C-alpha cells in the first residue's frame, strides 16, 4: 500500500490496513520500519507506537481500538480526522 501524506488522506479502512500490517509484521524489515514511522508521524498521537504495542485503558490493541483512540484524541485536540468514504 502506498503511504499517504496525512491522516486526512486515508479512510479508516485504508489506515486499518497499515495498522494490521504493523501488528502482523508484514513485509521486510525496511517496510515494517517505514509503516511504523509513518503511523507515528501521521497520527501525531503522543503515545505513538505504544497505541499498538502497549495499549492502555479501553484500547485492547486491536486495529479498531487503535483507530478509535486516534480519532478521539485528534478530535479532542482540534486535529482533522480520516477521509470520509
UniProtKB/Swiss-Prot annotation:
Naturally occurring in which organism (per UniProt): Escherichia coli
Similarity remark: Belongs to the colicins ColE2/ColE8/ColE9 and pyocins S1/S2 family.
Keywords of the record: Bacteriocin immunity, Plasmid
Molecular function per GO: toxic substance binding
One Pfam family recorded for the sequence: Colicin_Pyocin
Record gene name: imm
Protein known as: Colicin-E8 immunity protein in ColE6
GO biological process: bacteriocin immunity
